[in-house]
Amino acid sequence: MKKIILTTILFAVSALAFAQTERSIPREDIEWIDVWGPHNNDNDLPRVLLIGDSITRQYNAGVEQNLDGKAYVERLSTSKSLGDPALFGEIRTMLEQYDFDIIHFNNGLHGAGYTNEQYASALREIYGIVRSGAPHAKLIWATTTPVRVAPQMSELAPATQRSIDRNNIVREFMADKDVVINDLFESVGSHPEYYTDVDGVHLNQTGIAAAAKAVAGCISEVLDNGRTYSGLPVYWDTDKFYQAPGATPMPKLDKYGIKAALLDGVDFMGDKTQFFVYYGVPEGADADHPVPAMVLIHGGGGTAYWSWVKTWVDRGYAAIAMSNNGQFPVGIEDNPYEKEWGNWALVPGGIHLDCGDFGHALRPAEEQWAYCTIADIMLAHSFLRSLPGVDTERIGVTGNSWGGFLTLLSAAVDKRYKFAAPVYGCGFYDEFDLHAGQTGKAWERWLELWDPSHYIGNIDIPISWACGTNDFYFSFGPLQKSMALAKEKYSAVRSPMIHTDGADPAGQPAETFALADHFFKGGPDLPKVFAPTMLKNGKVAVEYCTAGRKVEKIEVIFSKGEGGRWEDRKWETHELPLPKKEGKVTFKVPEGASMFYVNVTTEGGIVASSPSIKTAS
């Protein structure tokens, strides 16, 4: 059995973090770190990481014995406490070494110099680091054990109140998260006979065995239940991003009543940042006459567009559009599609990362484009909600292309929206024609952290997709698979549909406007077309709901042949006779069709599409 100790490398990282931190950070008289990593070349069992202090170091061997043949157990034990930046570096380094299936965290006795508020803040940050560094690991959080008065041990020491306070903070924070609580405070701490009479903190041999059994039992139960992490791959501190950021007006860039500003953005690698926005509120909107609002997210190569904001303001909505590449449209004329398109100036103090640079995926999640952009979108949303006259209960989000990708992630993370409307944008990036042949650890890591297929199931609001059959960027097959993951959805699949990143209002599908008017202004719902039912003799029945809208036409869109790139596939359209009785259409599958779907178009050009179906042929 091969075993190695990573203490040297982690001690170096810890020492570096120690040297870079402020002297005001509370420190122990003796600082130490101890790492144990067995079975590094074995992958036949789940891998468990114990993170903690000297108590964890005490019971580590017993946990290994109890889980022998069931899991490999590794340990990061350290004197650093929550609140100490050095601990952040130690945990990140450990998570970079291995992929862990379960992480058991037990750290609360150290750091007496930190207030409860500081502990709570550090808890959020540590949780984010663990979630980002091990997105699919199952997380167990142990309550901190009490401290007893030595040598009699029957009396609890005053320091126990700190354990109680911190345990309450943990329980409150973890209440809505997919985290198992291992109550060591009760199962171990309630037994004075488990403590050594030297200091009233550490355990004797009986206590060590009991703690090891409790920890191993909790881990074993999680393994036996086949528990999987059902949350998001990456953690954002929404409490922080739900606060309205500071704003610096940029009146020289105001356009036709649409205002320009720099907003304070997410901290990036320890630095403060800013990002550019255009925003507007219709005239007459105030606290007595609030208006609904939209968050607008551009695609790759784009920036914040005043014209997009104005389109919505003219329809009676407040709106905000942010730059998600650290840029702003200095020097660009009113038409953003002139030859300078994509030639945007950089925002001083902005985050200048590329949405398509997958090589960054090996960095910590909070140093990657998707994390920073989602955080800034939340801040832009919070700023919009703070504006006088904006109805915070009536806000939707839409985005085109990469903005559609961001729309899906935003809707999963930010629970304040009422609907989401991605124009293109979907999951299963590894199945895109565009990324065929993409390999490597960075690519695999990007898929783990950011592929929308991990997020769509966590979206609790309706999703309205608008897309095309032959898009070069977002392939039709992955789009269909993504739609199937949604809890509640609308879809409009045109053949073909021009790809746009949102700068041109013509790129905003009619369905997005109609859905916003439905949810926020009492307009009719969108039509829906349900999955086709195969009948005998090659016939198909498709049911649909018009939502009170007049049907203009019903079409079957089909493709002949299979294989090859989705963008190269040929699609044909046959218009079907309108049925005498509305709500169901029956037709024969076109000869030679290998795949088809049905579109119902209602007045105003509102399209509703069925899921696609592969035929037996």
State where each predicted segment sits.
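Short beta-strand element of the alpha/beta-hydrolase
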Residues: 276, 288-299, 310
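Active-site segments of SGNH/GDSL-like serine hydrolases
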Residues: 104-110, 129-165
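Conserved SGNH/GDSL esterase-like catalytic core that processes O-acyl groups on lipids
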Residues: 22-125, 135, 164
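Cap/lid segment of the alpha/beta-hydrolase catalytic domain
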Residues: 310-374, 426-434
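Surface beta-strand/loop "capping" patches
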Residues: 507, 517-558, 572-584
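N-terminal cap/lid segment of alpha/beta-hydrolase-fold proteins
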Residues: 239-289
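Catalytic His-Asp segment of secreted/periplasmic serine-dependent ester chemistry enzymes
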Residues: 145-223
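Short beta-strand/loop motif that positions the catalytic acidic residue
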Residues: 459, 465-467
